Amino acid sequence: MIKLIVNADDFGLTEGTNYGIIDGHINGLVNSTTMMMNMPGTEHAVHLAKEYKTLGVGVHLVLTAGKPLLGDVPSLVSSDGLFHKQSVVWEGKVNPEEVEREWTAQIEKFLSYGLKPTHLDSHHHVHGLPILHDVLERLAATYNVPIRRCEEERAVRPFSDLFYSDFYADGVTEDYFVKLKERVQGEQTVEIMVHPAYIDPELVKRSSYVMDRVKELRILTESELPEGIELVKF
């Protein structure tokens, strides 16, 4: 039996995003999500997480969108006080100690709402940066949580055997889940990253990935899993 986690990123980004994720959970394949702690829809996401307890919720660590929770992290922000664009972060021009403090603050904020994280991942996959490997090791140990798999040599405490990020843009196809069994060999655990949402003005303002989120939601709520695949949580 193939064990499948369908994780919706960006919980908390906007209220429309939050509602899309909840719809994808109630009426579709979404069984896990990760919450952004520095976004306009964060408080709304917390409320929904407490209401829909069957949805596994982790923390979507942020380093490339919005403002940091801490004020004393100069290597993480541009002159406007916002996080750097992801291109800057991927160049490795961040102080790992500041990243660790900021990500710790994000996790602690999540915990302050009485929520328990199922796992950690990150916005734009920045937790895969080699210079942040030790940071991830410490966070995983401190909070006793698994972390989304990156490339094999950079995986830190992964839960899944495989991670697919290709249900995105042109990869959002009607038969994606039908063909999934052909891609997975044996009894493996697979995580698929998804981004369902309903469009609202805040989403249009904050993300370049908009229209395909609605298509994702439709496919996630209309698709059925092939025999031999079961949904599991972190």
Swiss-Prot record:
Signal peptide: none
Any one Pfam family match given in the protein's UniProt record, by short name: YdjC
Alphabetical UniProt keywords: Carbohydrate metabolism, Hydrolase, Magnesium, Metal-binding
Keyword Metal-binding assigned: yes
Top-level taxon: Bacteria
GO molecular function, one term: metal ion binding
InterPro entries for the chain: COD_ChbG_bac, Glyco_hydro/deAcase_b/a-brl, YdjC-like
Enzyme Commission number, as recorded: 3.5.1.-
Cofactors: Mg(2+)
Keyword Hydrolase set for record: yes
Biological process terms in GO annotation: polysaccharide catabolic process
Residues that hold Mg(2+) according to the record: H60, H123
Family of the protein in this entry: Belongs to the YdjC deacetylase family.
Role of this protein: Probably catalyzes the deacetylation of acetylated carbohydrates an important step in the degradation of oligosaccharides.
UniProt-recorded name of the protein: Carbohydrate deacetylase
Protein's organism: Bacillus anthracis
